[in-house]
Amino acid sequence: MHWNIISKEQSSSSVSLPTLDSSEPCHIEVILRAIPEKGLQNNESTFKIDPYENTVLFRTNNPLHETTKETHSTFQFDKVFDANATQEDVQKFLVHPIINDVLNGYNGTVITYGPSFSGKSYSLIGSKESEGILPNICKTLFDTLEKNEETKGDSFSVSVLAFEIYMEKTYDLLVPLPERKPLKLHRSSSKMDLEIKDICPAHVGSYEDLRSYIQAVQNVGNRMACGDKTERSRSHLVFQLHVEQRNRKDDILKNSSLYLVDLHGAEKFDKRTESTLSQDALKKLNQSIEALKNTVRSLSMKERDSAYSAKGSHSSAYRESQLTEVLKDSLGGNRKTKVILTCFLSNVPTTLSTLEFGDSIRQINNKVTDNTTGLNLKKKMDLFIQDMKIKDDNYVAQINILKAEIDSLKSLHNKSLPEDDEKKMLENTKKENIKLKLQLDSITQLLSSSTNEDPNNRIDEEVSEILTKRCEQIAQLELSFDRQMNSNSKLQQELEYKKSKEEALESMNVRLLEQIQLQEREIQELLTTNAILKGELETHTKLTETRSERIKSLESSVKELSLNKSAIPSPRRGSMSSSSGNTMLHIEEGSEISNSPWSANTSSKPLVWGARKVSSSSIATTGSQESFVARPFKKGLNLHSIKVTSSTPKSPSSGS
């Protein structure tokens, strides 16, 4: 299997939408923890620590300290702890901000850096007397998650990874030692995500479940702190916590991961310090720290000088070592990184090198963004798009229907009375009316002028005919006008009917849309609930599998211990029930020993084989009379002694 150690694979029901770059620059925080000086009593210290200003002043008053630095150099860090600081002081400054970042969906990294035996493992992992940052973070994190689950109803799942990098090879610390094999690292070209093939994550549901895995890491840390060179004490230790939180109320999903990295000594190893290693092994041992220094140097130069293009150099530096491959996202990526420097103030070269490394890495800016997405967002977006398509199709169909009705009304109106013909008819009617008025006026004048004269029959007939024709034309025009008015009224009624029908359809569509929106909200709630339940089921399933594997491992260990215990020889007493020998006591009918009290109530049997083993030293084999004392049985007869001789046997004395 492949395991993504940079960002946990998100559930298929959630997806991040393409948005604007909301990342914020965040420089790598550097914390210095000084170890008490040795060998500089009654002399002015070379390094002056100011825990209030968080500065370290380097002074070269001693001429024996050869260095290329100036006489006075000041190093500024985010926090400086002097030699009087305790574990509680360091944890008070670090633990709660780290946990708040994890709970808010940010990725984080804590790295310890410094020379060997300067307190790196002690600060990160701790000891039996004083816990370090790692167990304190785990305990506080679970307390907060469980509290949020009780008060807010949030659900969560936690998984852990633990591996070490030794000689440019990665090993899983959560598998038994005989089964540990080198693992392969793989990083896709388009993403920052790093995958470790065949690594075994452990899913935990409480701090009690996590303690056994923390103990495995503590064992490695103690091995490194003690400098046990028979083991891989010169290895880099990486412990990862992945936290997934589901907020049902706000309908959001938060994914965050935390690296806790304990590096081996930052000094360069050679034959004087590692006499048992070959030159190739020493080269691989120094390769990871050198690659880390080169990467930090390249990135800090890029930050100091914007014109400096370090793209090629630091990209190649990432690939120089598996350590830098693992820490790639912590150096300039999407992580809030904190580096804890530990050093001996009495050792000027190593302390100065450590301070310079801290000054360089502090100039690197990471682009940090929270890993918060909508719960079940992909399915909701698919549902939303599907609903929008349905609504669009509904609106398009409604528009097409209305367009068709308008076209039909226009065609009916055009068929009943073309617009041009109607205008012409109205104009002709107006002209005829004007002519008729003029004719009536002329006729009226003629009649008025000829009232005293005798009317001309011919003129009267012509006038009468003209008036009759005009009256018929007027009647026809009025009839056509009435018909047109009736047609217009019918069209108006049809238009009003269509409008009322359209309003009814619109109101029906509104009601349907309201029903669709209601069903959509119900479906979204169901999808959210299903996603939460699915996530919880997956979490419990993984937790069950992890516990089952843990139980099998413990059963196997118990079985091996029982077999080893049974294989250890133990002193045996001379008794009839001893299993130290394979000699069987053969008793036959008629033999003299069968008449002894030891064989009471057994003489009726023709042949009896002893049901217990006796040691080879329990029965005398010499020719002279020798005896042995048999221990009493736990059950049956209590026989004190049996005497066996090569001559005529005598009855042994009865013990009871």
Curated annotation (Swiss-Prot):
Residues modified as Phosphothreonine: 583
Gene3D superfamilies tied to this protein: Kinesin motor domain
Presence of keyword ATP-binding: yes
Any one Gene Ontology BP term: microtubule-based movement
Record-level GO cellular component terms: cellular bud neck; cellular bud tip; cytoplasm; incipient cellular bud site; kinesin complex; mating projection tip; microtubule
Residues holding ATP: 114-121
Domain Kinesin motor: 27-364
Cell compartments where the protein resides: Cytoplasm, Cytoskeleton
UniProt keyword annotation of ATP-binding present: yes
Gene Ontology molecular function, alphabetical: ATP binding; ATP hydrolysis activity; cytoskeletal motor activity; microtubule binding; plus-end-directed microtubule motor activity
Other noteworthy facts: Present with 1920 molecules/cell in log phase SD medium.
Function: Possible microtubule-based motor that can interact or substitute with myosin 2 (MYO2).
Family: Belongs to the TRAFAC class myosin-kinesin ATPase superfamily. Kinesin family.
Protein name: Kinesin-related protein SMY1
